[in-house]
Structures are given as structure tokens and as C-alpha cells.
Amino acid sequence: MIINHNMSAINANRVLGBT
């Protein structure tokens, strides 16, 4: 389940960096 948390953070970072 910890991996899921990491994926969520990476997803948010990707969205922010895409802007």
C-alpha cells in the first residue's frame, strides 16, 4: 500500500510539472 502512496505523489508532481 505504501507504493500506492508514492504513485499518488508522483502523479501530482507530474501534473504540476506539466503545467
UniProtKB/Swiss-Prot annotation:
Keyword Zinc: no
Segments passing through the bilayer: none
Keywords: Bacterial flagellum, Periplasm
Localization per Swiss-Prot or TrEMBL: Periplasmic flagellum; Periplasm
Any Gene Ontology CC annotation: periplasmic flagellum
Cleaved signal peptide residues: none
Top-level lineage group: Bacteria
Keyword RNA-binding: no
Subunit organization: The flagellum consists of an outer layer composed of repeating units of FlaA around a core that contains one or all of five antigenically related polypeptides.
Task performed by this protein: Component of the core of the flagella.
Family: Belongs to the bacterial flagellin family.
Protein name (database record): Flagellar filament 32 kDa core protein
Native organism: Spirochaeta aurantia
Taxonomic path: Bacteria, Pseudomonadati, Spirochaetota, Spirochaetia, Spirochaetales
